[in-house]
């Protein structure tokens, strides 16, 4: 399937990239009778989607309605307008709301992709009008990877942080139950491990679970669905530039197998190849400083902004270039990329401080806002918040995970890799000694911990209201009272881990209209060119409305792009986009 049949050099649609949005667009284009080619620069397919949680934020979805959930287009738009503010384009937002629910219904009805509703996963901004305490995020079901046959080795491996014990598949719903230590969590872990251990035939082939979960499940099920449709996917095929016929994009130039090929696209080219987070030059040009490509939790060598630069060269407009899908990350020696720190920041008994030993943000806040606060505080303190430090005590270490550290009751310090000490984590018998090790103000840290310990007793964080809303509490420990996100730091030894200002992709990119067409500075579409996912400026503006706020729009606008191409509608003035500053 991934062998290059170069006897065909002309297709109706060419898709650049192989993440969830790219493959979704290819699938819907193929289902409307169009010939489709996918090209991928890497030797693996799946992109950042494959290492992600795979969740998609889909308001008014049929899964939620089926269990009696209450949502509406009006409520969803109220929330999105409040979340995106001046950075939101009402026309694009309306297009998203109009097409997201139909997209996932058609996809799950006509492919191997399977989702379930995360009915207790809240929107990220529960304080805003129109927010729901659950039901808009969908979680991929497990997928049997043996169905991929010869394409299995080409699937990008999931991040170790998305697997139980680094090898066992579980859904986001299972992971939440275990992390929140909800009733029955230990029995759940036992069942998952038993299922894995008893699959003797598969374990003789691989140490990884037969089943894919999260983003790996989404990508695997999409790839199998494309195999069912005989849609070719060329790996090791580097996008070089677009081909033009007048002002119309009519194909692409690629490098593969030591050759430069010109591939014609009769109906359209869809950019779905990710952002520019792995391009240090572009990071330094556009993003807040300091910034490092090595801090990004996305695969190194990919997402270097080739589509962005090609679009700029033909007059495309851009927006939101100084924003990313921020997420704090922890570097782990021997791993190709750092790990994002998501749920752990809400666990009780850990705090995050700057170099002054002071807290500067609600640790349980959404990850985009968390890193944004790192940069804001870094500016205020003269460079003392990038990096920041997560601090926890011996009780936390025994009970909870943090980044690559499993709870010590499962993996004690004696079983950790020796090279991790003073690189991944720092350890000392007292807070003062720990502060000196990591270069944090000792008095500042001691005072901060004393204050947090008082807050843990009362259950009220007077500084940042940690645990004060349903989103914070989602990953809190339900057994901890009165606040599931607050516990004292008292029991030595004490630990620290460095948090970098990382990301899971860039947010800015080529500006598009409601049809996913790339537009020029005057808002007019560039004929034949579409962009989705992190190639494009996010429809969500500078907000992150809920889990799956990246993949949901990527897949939805992939669906929109495929439909627009299939319809044969020509560009008109009504297709103008609002240019965001």
Feature annotation, model-predicted:
Residues 1-13, 31, 216, 220, ...:
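Extreme N-terminal leader/targeting segments of oxidoreductases
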Residues 13-38:
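N-terminal Rossmann-like FAD-binding beta1-loop-alpha1 element of flavoenzymes
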Residues 41-232, 352, 359, 398, ...:
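Conserved N-terminal/central alpha/beta ligand/cofactor-binding core
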Residues 126, 132-134, 141-188, 308-310, ...:
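An anion/pyrophosphate-binding glycine-rich loop and adjacent beta-alpha core
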Residues 200-266, 308:
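Helical element adjacent to the flavin cofactor pocket in flavoenzyme catalytic cores
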Residues 209-216, 228, 256-335, 339, ...:
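Glycine-rich loop(s) and the adjacent beta-strand/alpha-helix scaffold that form part
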Residues 241, 248, 444-539, 543:
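A glycine-rich dinucleotide-binding beta-alpha-beta segment and adjacent secondary-structure elements
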Residues 310-317, 446, 553-573:
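Internal hydrophobic alpha-helix adjacent to the cofactor/substrate pocket in enzyme cavities
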């Amino acid at each position: 399937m991934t062998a290059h049949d170069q006897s065909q050099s002309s297709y109706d649609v060419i898709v650049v990239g192989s993440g969830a949005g790219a493959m979704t667009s290819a699938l819907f284009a193929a289902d409307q009778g169009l010939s489709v080619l996918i090209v991928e620069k890497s030797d693996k397919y799946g992109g950042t989607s494959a290492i992600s949680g795979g969740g998609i934020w889909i308001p008014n979805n049929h899964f939620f309605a089926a269990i009696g959930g209450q949502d509406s287009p009006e409520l969803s738009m109220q929330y999105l307008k409040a979340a995106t503010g001046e950075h939101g384009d009402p026309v694009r937002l309306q297009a998203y709301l109009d097409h997201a629910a139909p997209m996932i219904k058609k996809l799950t009805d006509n492919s191997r992709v399977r989702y379930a509703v995360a009915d207790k996963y809240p929107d990220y901004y529960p304080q805003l009008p129109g927010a729901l305490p659950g039901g808009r995020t969908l979680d991929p079901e497990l997928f049997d990877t043996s169905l991929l046959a010869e394409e299995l080795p080409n699937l990008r491996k999931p991040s170790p942080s998305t697997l139980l014990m680094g090898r066992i598949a579980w859904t986001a719903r299972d992971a939440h139950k275990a992390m929140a230590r909800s009733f029955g969590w230990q029995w759940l872990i036992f069942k998952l491990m038993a299922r894995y251990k008893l699959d003797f035939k598969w374990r003789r082939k691989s140490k990884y679970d037969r089943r894919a979960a999260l983003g790996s499940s989404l990508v695997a099920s999409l790839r199998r669905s494309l195999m069912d449709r005989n849609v070719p996917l060329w790996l090791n095929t580097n996008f070089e530039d677009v081909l033009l016929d007048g002002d119309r994009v009519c194909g692409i130039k690629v490098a593969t197998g030591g050759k430069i090929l010109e591939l014609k696209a009769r109906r359209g080219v869809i950019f779905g190849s990710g952002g520019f987070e792995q391009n240090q030059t572009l990071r330094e040009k556009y993003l807040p400083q300091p910034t490092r490509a090595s801090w990004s939790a996305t695969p190194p060598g990919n997402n270097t902004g080739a589509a962005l630069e090609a679009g700029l060269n033909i007059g495309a407009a851009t927006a939101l270039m100084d924003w990313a899908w921020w997420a704090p990350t922890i570097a782990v020696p021997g791993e190709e990329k750092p790990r994002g720190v998501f749920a752990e920041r809400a666990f009780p008994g850990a705090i995050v401080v700057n170099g002054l030993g002071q807290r500067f943000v609600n640790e349980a806040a959404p990850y985009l806002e968390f890193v944004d606060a790192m940069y804001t505080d870094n500016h205020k303190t003269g460079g003392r918040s990038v990096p920041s430090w997560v601090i926890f005590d011996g009780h936390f270490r025994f009970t909870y995970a943090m980044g690559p550290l499993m709870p010590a009751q499962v993996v004690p310090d004696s079983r950790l890799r020796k090279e991790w000490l003073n690189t991944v984590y720092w350890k000392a018998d007292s807070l003062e000694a720990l502060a000196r090790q990591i270069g944090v103000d000792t008095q500042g840290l001691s005072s901060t911990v004393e204050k947090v310990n008082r807050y843990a007793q009362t259950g009220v964080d007077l500084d940042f209201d940690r645990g004060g809303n349903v989103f914070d509490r989602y990953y809190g420990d339900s057994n901890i009272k009165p606040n599931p996100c607050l516990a004292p730091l008292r029991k030595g030894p004490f630990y620290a881990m460095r948090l970098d200002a990382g990301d899971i992709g860039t947010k800015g990119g080529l500006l598009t209209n409601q049809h996913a067409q790339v537009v020029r500075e005057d808002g007019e579409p560039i004929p034949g060119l579409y962009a989705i996912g992190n190639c494009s400026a996010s429809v969500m503006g500078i907000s992150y409305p809920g889990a799956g706020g990246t993949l949901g729009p990527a897949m939805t606008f992939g669906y929109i792009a495929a439909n627009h191409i299939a319809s044969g509608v020509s560009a008109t003035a009504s297709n103008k986009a609002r240019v965001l500053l």
